[in-house]
UniProtKB/Swiss-Prot annotation:
The chain crosses the membrane at residues 7-27. Disulfide bonds: none annotated. Gene3D superfamilies: NAD(P)-binding Rossmann-like Domain (3.40.50.720). Pathway: Cofactor metabolism; retinol metabolism. The active site is at residue 205. It is an enzyme of class 1 (oxidoreductase). It is found in: Microsome membrane; Endoplasmic reticulum membrane. It catalyses: all-trans-retinol + NADP(+) = all-trans-retinal + NADPH + H(+). This is Retinol dehydrogenase 10-B. It comes from Danio rerio (Zebrafish).
């Protein structure tokens, strides 16, 4: 095929991809079933991780929950088991007792510090031994230091990078080989809108999320280059979610109604729809797509001007001040 013909084919494919993307706005794609599939969720003990676990439980997936907090992880597991009990069909037949073992909830919990690759690899080996091969990997675990750059201890910066970014390397390296062998699987990266554009005062968090997105996109291209179309990738980039992680963050009060913090339940439902329809990327709310596009075409000074108008230039400062006050109070109580 000469270059002119190839250019025509490429142009047609690009136009066709726009047509397909537009069609999905009007025709909702059919959601795939994850019943019986093994789903690993990191950071499952609270926040979005817990909600992801409950959503997958409602769809009868086998849950493998990872968290550094054993107690909160077990609480999530018990919530999932309760969902399983409610979903259990009541046949009323005489042989229903024989069917019960097939209907028992399948929830496994593991205590794992995803910032440590040795812990990740060891836990992944336990999962393969005790549960089997996995089908879905939800890289969700995340932390925020809540400190200005010059006030933030190096250890906190390192931990933010390790949990929010490096952990994605370790979990993927642990589970991807079998996915490649079977040409089957789904990897979900729960990032943030702060991995697409930035604001002042959260340099470490933004850098970690930019890194996670870069890792995700590069891996997506690698899988396509290897013709591993059976392995799906979904990137989740929500706006600030009302989980308490960024409590105190404020923009200009006149603009606040247009950019409210997302309800966690809404965020996860939108993400689940994207995952179950094999959507490559989901930004919530949709205006985040426009914000990301504007960043690529507007001069930097224009972006700064818009930030100041919205109040986004210092929106994290109340949150940082609140974190600092909380830290000082804790130190005074403990006599540090």
């Amino acid at each position: 095929m000469n270059i002119a013909t190839e250019l025509f084919v490429v142009t047609f494919k690009i136009i066709w991809s726009f047509v397909l993307a537009g069609a999905k706005w009007f025709i909702r794609p059919r959601e795939k079933s994850v019943e019986g599939q093994v789903c690993v969720i990191t950071g499952a003990g609270s926040g979005l991780g817990r909600l992801f676990a409950l959503e997958f439980a409602r769809r009868r997936a086998t849950l493998v929950l990872w968290d550094i907090n054993r107690q909160s992880n077990e609480e999530t597991a018990e919530m999932a088991r309760e969902i399983y009990r409610q979903l259990k069909p009541s046949t009323g037949s005489s042989d229903s007792v024989q069917e019960l073992p097939l209907l028992q909830p399948k929830v496994y919990t593991y205590m794992c510090d995803v910032s440590k690759r040795e812990s990740v690899y060891l836990t992944a080996e336990k999962v393969r031994s005790e549960v089997g091969d996995i089908d879905l990997l939800i890289n969700n675990a995340g932390v925020v230091s809540g400190r200005h750059l010059l006030d933030c201890p190096d250890e906190l910066i390192e931990r933010t990078m390790m949990v929010n970014c490096h952990a994605h390397f370790w979990t993927t390296k642990a589970f991807l080989p079998k996915m490649l062998e079977l040409n089957h699987g789904h990897i979900v990266t729960v990032a943030s809108s702060l991995g697409l554009f930035t604001t002042a005062g959260v340099e470490d968090y933004c850098a970690s999320k930019f890194g996670a997105i870069g890792f995700h996109e590069s891996l997506s291209h690698e899988l396509k280059a290897a013709d591993k179309d059976g392995i799906k990738m979904t990137l989740v980039c929500p706006f600030l979610v009302d989980t308490g992680m960024f409590e105190g963050c404020k923009i200009r009060k006149e603009m606040a109604p247009f950019f409210p913090p997302l309800k966690p339940e809404y965020c996860v439902k939108q993400a689940m729809r994207a995952i179950l329809t094999d959507q490559p990327m989901i930004c919530t709310p949709r205006v985040m797509y426009m914000v990301t596009f504007m960043k690529t075409v507007l001069p930097f000074d224009a972006i700064v001007c818009m930030y100041k108008f919205i109040g986004a230039d210092k929106c994290m400062y109340p949150f940082l001040a609140q974190r600092k006050e909380s830290t000082n109070n804790n130190e005074s109580k403990t006599g540090i």
